[in-house]
Amino acid sequence: MNPPAIDKVPDVTFVVAAYNSADTIVRAIESALAQEGVTVEVVVVDDCSADATPALVAAIPDPRVRLIALDRNRGPGGARNAGIGAARGRWIAVLDSDDTVRPDRLRRMIERADAAGAQIAVDNLDVVSLDGRSLRMFSEAELARLPQLTLPAFIESNVLFRSEHNFGYMKPIFERRFLENQQLRFDEALRIGEDYILLASALACGGRCAVEPSAGYIYHIREGSISRVLRLDHIDAMIAADEAFLRRYALDGLAQKMQHRRMRGFREARSFLVLVEQLKKRSLAGALKTALADPFALRHLSMPIAARLRRLAARFVHPSSHSAPRAAPVTAAAERSPLGNDPRISKG
């Protein structure tokens, strides 16, 4: 483990959870170290990689970089929690091991947060696809009209099957003291949606979130990224996390209304996934029962999975003309892929 560079508390600690990230980890770290106008440290938490990731990090000569090697795989939430526990900075910024940040990102965000008296800040982001295209996720004019991100707006944007990009893709920074005082950490039981629960919890316990309209975070989609496949166990885990969130925090009327929409989206998604499984098994009675119990689940046939679902239905009707159906997972288009409803370009 590299020792801390200096005794002075840095402005920002970048927390980078890394798992088999040898091809991108150095690029991510270098972008963090290149921040202008703020002092930084980078805490890389290796989550039991089987490649050269820890060796590459350990070889970086900059004393601002620290490596923590976990003795067991804890997933992204657990690795980030280990990094937060080791952080020394006033602010904590999570950086994915295959992404990068622009040099002025943290200066802009901290200035925005300090001016608003905020404990949290989010900004815009650019998404770079496999073919090198770069698209801005939100219009700067749209975000300029949103000086602060509120809990109702955040929940509403994270309703499954919405056609708009959701604020859940933003990468917030948090005041470390605020996280400590509120005892906030990532939910290690979640593999999809852990970012959402942390920011929602921070807003629910009174955190103020400033919005920086410029794009300082660069979200890279690459081959080999964790596939964004939405499964029944993911839905059940997110429902359980939301139920725990509701038990912990008292929401105002508007936030409750948005939360009701979000839970309804989960129920529809669950019914839809059950329907797909029943069609795959050629269980007409089960499929009809599910459709009758939750007819709203059928309206999502415009999703990319629709073509697969129709093929499954055709195989059910004409089983002799087709081989056994293959699994047809619902992709994270349900939560809106960063470049649109295309499962080929979504990343974990």
Swiss-Prot record:
The keyword Isomerase does not apply. Gene3D superfamilies: Spore Coat Polysaccharide Biosynthesis Protein SpsA, Chain A. Keywords: Cytoplasm, Exopolysaccharide synthesis, Glycosyltransferase, Plasmid, Transferase. The keyword Transmembrane helix does not apply. Residues 324-334 have a biased composition (Low complexity). One of its GO terms (biological process) is polysaccharide biosynthetic process. It comes from the Bacteria. This is Succinoglycan biosynthesis protein ExoO. It comes from Rhizobium meliloti (strain 1021).
